[in-house]
Amino acid sequence: MAVIRDMMPVFELFQPASVEDATALLREHGDQAWVMAGGLDSFDWFKDRVKRPAVVVDLGGIETLKGNTATANGLEIGAMTSLTEVVEHPEVRERYGLLSEAAELVASPQIRNQGTIGGNNTQDTRCWYYRDGWTCYRAGGNICYADTPTSMNREPVSYTHLTLPTKA
């Protein structure tokens, strides 16, 4: 029998206007809360009933998390900045061309208009296209990514604060 996915599980939606309000909501609701950026990935999880949060905290109304800001050390990109904004921003194109090109390769224009840099960097991937199908020696595979002739090193990155260095 096919699963009917005509409705999402019930949840309480909060749309805070500040980082402080969002933090307070997340502290109050703990593991029962889901943080939503652009929402593209979130709604799929909800409709498939894989994720069933009691509370959803939508960051879309927090203006301080949007946009690109030049800093003394480079460029700071807000977590709620759309991928389209990253692609089209003149300074990103000129000084961080690789980032602009990479953002432009994400999905379709419609998804780039809604998807955010923060949401894309923290999404809970479930698609094999986003996973490395080859495992390293430690995981029973036949390659060591940390020790190759090209010195390819696969290190995890923290996405809590993304600051790009200034191009020399």
Label each residue range with its predicted role.
Residues M1-L162:
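C-terminal structural segment of proteins
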Residues T163-A168:
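A short, hydrophobic C-terminal helix/tail in secreted or cell-surface proteins
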